Regions:
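An N-terminally biased module of ancient metal coordination in phosphate/nucleic-acid-related enzymes
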Residues: 1-103
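Extended substrate/RNA-proximal surfaces in nucleic-acid metabolism proteins
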Residues: 2, 72-157
Length: 157
């Protein structure tokens, strides 16, 4: 493989939240569907065809707190501009202690090839305690935590 082009720089946006994000969903729209359509339209308008090097984005990481559900939705919807060559899942977490009155955020960007095992290899391994009960960060355990905190939530998830 011989190339005379040299290095090629590409823009990556590794912290992109979506509608229905777990925290601070500030997207506008009268319904979830409307928020998502506007989201995809805004990205397409900004990136365009990918020809403008100042706007072209080759890689996007879909970010959410303790979840990859919206990443899966973006992949299933397949509505990003074709100039976006790779979409990565990015799990965001806040840890203690806070720094300068602000929480410390940690981002875990995963290879899309391991999506099917993130629940068992990542979320199930994150453990914490609430009222002397241990929970993991898996989807089912977070529901159990919610029901423990407020039993009126039972059966809503």
């Amino acid at each position: 493989m011989e190339s005379t082009k040299g290095s090629e720089w590409r823009r990556w946006e590794l912290h992109i939240h979506t509608p229905d994000t777990q925290k601070n969903d500030n997207f506008t729209g009268s319904s979830s569907e409307e928020k998502w359509e506007k989201y995809y339209q805004d990205i397409s308008t900004y990136i365009g065809s990918g020809d403008d090097p100042l706007k072209a984005v080759a890689v996007i990481a879909i970010t959410d707190y303790l979840s990859i559900d919206n990443y899966k939705k973006v992949i299933a919807d397949n509505k990003l501009p074709t100039s976006v060559k790779l979409v990565l899942p990015n799990v965001e977490m806040r840890i203690q202690p806070i720094a300068n009155d602000s929480p410390i955020n940690i981002h875990f960007v995963f290879n899309p090839d391991i999506i099917s095992s993130i629940e068992s290899r990542f979320f199930l391994k994150i453990n914490f305690r609430y009222n002397s009960t241990t929970f993991s960060a898996s989807h089912s355990e977070l529901i159990r935590l919610g029901n423990t905190i407020d039993s009126s939530l039972e059966g809503l998830a």
